Amino acid sequence: MKIISMSMDSWIQRAALMLLGLVIVAPFFGWTASIVGYAEPLENAAKMTGATDAAMNLNPGVLPDYTVGGFSGPIGTLISAGVGTVLTLIVAFGAGRLLES
């Protein structure tokens, strides 16, 4: 049982490092998307059909457009990526604990 535990710890460490790496490069992807003029396809379709004019924004979300108020684009994206990763891990570990019991 000890061998399984050690390999699980190693797997978790590798996964955590991979997630940390993705969080760190997230602002780069946001920056390159703005450079090439990328826009979400659903937003493009809404603009083409005129749906954005009639839309009401009732709840912009916790981190709208992957930004954090008061921070510049890349820094806000980095914070948003970190928050999203942590929340996802909390939900995943919680679900894992429920499935184990």
Curated annotation (Swiss-Prot):
Q: Which UniProt keywords apply?
A: Cell membrane, Membrane, Signal, Transmembrane, Transmembrane helix, Transport
Q: Which Pfam families match?
A: PDGLE (PF13190)
Show the stretches that span the lipid bilayer: 75-95
Pull one GO CC term from this UniProt entry: plasma membrane
- What membrane topology is given? Single-pass membrane protein
In the UniProt record, does the keyword Disulfide bond occur?
Answer: no
Designated name of the protein = Putative metal transport protein HQ_3622A
Q: Which organism is it from?
A: Haloquadratum walsbyi (strain DSM 16790 / HBSQ001)
